Amino acid sequence: MNKKALWTTGYAFLNIAYFAAFCTVHACAAVFLMSRGFTNTQVGMLLAIANITSALFQPFIADVIDKKGWLTNRRFILISCTVILIGSLMLRFITDSKPVIFIVYAIIYMIQFAYQPVMTALCFEYRKKGCDIVYGLARGLGSAGFAVTSAFIGRAVEAKGADLLPAVTVIIMAVSAVAVFFYRPSGKEKAAEAAEVTEGTEKSHGKVTDFFREYPAFLLFVIASICFFFAHNMINDFMIQIIRALGGGETELGYSNFLQAILELPVMALIGFVLRKVSPAKLLVFSGAAFFVKILILIFAQNMVWMFVSQSFQLFAYAVFIPAGAYYVSHTMAENDQVKGQAYVTSAITIGGVFSNLLSGIILDNLGMRPMLITGTAVCFVGVLISFAALRSPDRKGDQPYEYRS
């Protein structure tokens, strides 16, 4: 196996494990929490608190990592895996204390989101050190890991109960921790790392105001992304309720998650070729339009067929957004700002989730499914308009409006 295949395989394995656990923790959050007696509103509150904490935590951690001290991308991922493992082990055995379940689940939900941008930053860090990683392929295989887990976990939970979810998470996180521990540069890559530390780079923009003043178009993309993921998280966090309203159950939940995740693989694997012709900024706008169509379909859905049609738009929405966002940051930002840039992308996803969590459960409990989906559609449409405005703004202060740089 050549070095390119070796590094890509290792990074793909980290992504597969991450998104398998993402399925059991995030995609199945409502299933697990409602099995412990939580209402829709309580689920929404818990996820909102976890998302708010994560949105605040991510840029802070990114700034620490960007300063290149003891805390590296790899070490933070290892710490995160350990925390999620311990928390999931606690959830497996705590069944009757809702306050404890609330706190522990919020922590592991928050930590898992917090290390997602660090996973992306790890790839681009290693690439700069000479580790030839095909990001799109590895990230797409992560989605395939989510898809395969979804296909089995829905039926398994229906048969064995929601207690299975934290048990599976414990196993996945144990494997992840071992894999991360051994996934590190050696030899030539370490020499490149040492050279990088002594070389000197552009000034890091630690303050939020300084950062977004330096990258005006990125600020608009972040705001647009919040709107996109308001709609996206509304569907994902309350998917079981949407599916039940359309006549399905946990098995259909698994199939639905499988469909949207497996469709991500070919797009992410081929995104490098697309980026030779289309700029990351334009792809971000395109993905926003796909998020809009995806939730719009659900307003008029009458059965599970339309749910699957809606989920198929993941091919153009999330599957395009994630790699396009990663490449946008990598190509337009100074090296010492890139972990923060990746963190702000994930923070936008998280903040969208916060507003969705705060409103969706309340709207669902008091007004019903369709008003919830109409709200998500309207917010997503605003995001599409903002993303178009971003194309007319410079990516860095003093530049012309966005133009892709190879």
Residue map of PLM features:
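Hydrophobic core of transmembrane alpha-helices in multi-pass small-molecule transporters
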Residues: 16, 98-115, 226, 306-320
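Intracellular juxtamembrane helix-capping segments at the cytosolic ends
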Residues: 113-128, 320-333
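Loop-to-transmembrane helix entry/capping segments in MFS-fold secondary transporters
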Residues: 40-41, 129-141, 250-251, 333-345
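Structural signature of the two symmetry-related core transmembrane helices
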Residues: 75-89, 282-297
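Juxtamembrane intracellular "pre-TM" segments in multi-pass secondary transporters
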Residues: 1-5, 184-222
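Helix-to-loop junctions at the C-terminal end of transmembrane segments
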Residues: 57-71, 157, 267-279, 364-365
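Helix-loop boundary and gating motifs at the non-cytosolic
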Residues: 2-51, 217-224, 228-256
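Symmetry-related core transmembrane helices of the 12-TM Major Facilitator Superfamily/SLC fold
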Residues: 165-182, 372-390
